[in-house]
Amino acid sequence: MIHSTDNSFCLGYRKDNNLKSDEFFIKRFDNDLCNNLINDFNKFISKENLQKINKLSVSIGPANFNASRLIVVLARTISQQINCPIDSFSSFEIMAKRIALKNNIFTNKKTFWIYKKLKRNGFIAGKYEIYHKEKDSSDLVIRETILPKGVKELESKEVTFEANYDDKEDLKELLNLANKNLLNSNLHPWKKVLPLYPISPIN
């Protein structure tokens, strides 16, 4: 799994869906991500283990513009070279469950927005919905109903929460989401995985 935030680059690996096998690599970066990305990746996973990977997942943003672009290119390249399926999730979708749990949002069909204030004007915001297939479902499932996009203002009548990146917890959730997609055969060819650019890189 490959993930990035505004200032960190993260890798995660899980063997046979065993949570105890989870391995993580988290590194803060300034302007040096491009120079060290491949070296850090090669240190994290050996060529032998790379060939054993049967599924890749990558976060596509919104996050640092260059980081999102670079990690998606890396994930697409690996998927193509070792011929394994790939899926992707927005950074907000990855943190949505954690935010819902923290704020006691459990009601089925309940919706909320996650937003990030831009340096200049406006926000990036995505919409999420609690989704239980069964009334007694103990596992909190959240659907992304609107991909993160640029908006001028937040809806005053909607429930909103500011985006809050947590490298390790979000890596764990990315692994969990990826496993659910694998079990549901919800996978894509590498060509369909693209970075999410709600705004231009200058904002």
Please give the residue ranges for each predicted region.
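N-terminal phosphate-binding loop and adjacent alpha-helix
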Residues: 26-43
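DPxDG-like acidic metal-binding loop motif
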Residues: 55-91
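Phosphate/pyrophosphate-binding loops at sites that engage ATP/ADP/AMP, CoA/4′-phosphopantetheine
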Residues: 40-55
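Short glycine-rich phosphate-binding loop at a beta-alpha junction
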Residues: 51-60, 158-165
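Recognition helices and adjacent regulatory flanks at domain boundaries
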Residues: 21-24, 51
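Oxyanion-binding and handling regions
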Residues: 1-21, 29-30, 87-203
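Short glycine/serine- and small hydrophobic-enriched flexible loop segments
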Residues: 42-43, 76, 80, 100-101, ...
